[in-house]
């Protein structure tokens, strides 16, 4: 009789669940923080602890990359395009919220 791999499946599902939870907790910056970073455009100095020395950075996604080639591939990806679209959109204001409810 073949050996069951239920322990492996359980381990795998736990890893996936923990990975998703960690991504939710320590995910990318909020949109308003990203907009502030883009407006300030601070120069990033060399940091040996960051990938690529901190030179290849995507502001919208808050990610560092090893080379410029990898950064360009990332900028062509769908997750980056979605995030960039979110950043470009105008944020809702209190006035918009009141209008939607019908207070004004």
Curated annotation (Swiss-Prot):
SUPFAM superfamilies in the cross-refs: beta-beta-alpha zinc fingers (SSF57667)
Localisation per UniProt entry: Nucleus; Cytoplasm
Pfam families the record matches: zf-C2H2_jaz (PF12171)
Cytoplasm as UniProt keyword: yes
Single GO MF annotation: zinc ion binding
Keywords, in A-Z order: Cytoplasm, Metal-binding, Nucleus, Ribosome biogenesis, Zinc, Zinc-finger
GO CC terms of this entry: cytoplasm; nucleus
Entry function: Involved in pre-60S ribosomal particles maturation by promoting the nuclear export of the 60S ribosome.
Protein name per UniProt: Zinc finger C2H2 protein ECU02_0310
Species in which this protein is naturally found: Encephalitozoon cuniculi (strain GB-M1) (Microsporidian parasite)
């Amino acid at each position: 009789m073949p050996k069951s791999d239920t322990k492996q499946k359980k381990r795998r599902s736990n890893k996936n669940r923990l990975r998703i939870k960690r991504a939710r907790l320590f995910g990318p910056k909020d949109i308003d923080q990203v907009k502030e970073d883009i407006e300030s455009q601070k120069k990033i100095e060399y940091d040996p602890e960051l990938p690529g020395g901190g030179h290849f950075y995507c502001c919208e996604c808050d990610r560092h990359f090893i080379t410029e080639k990898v950064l360009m591939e990332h900028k062509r990806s769908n997750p980056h395009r979605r995030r960039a679209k979110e950043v470009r959109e105008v944020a809702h204001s209190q006035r918009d919220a009141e209008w939607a409810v019908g207070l004004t």
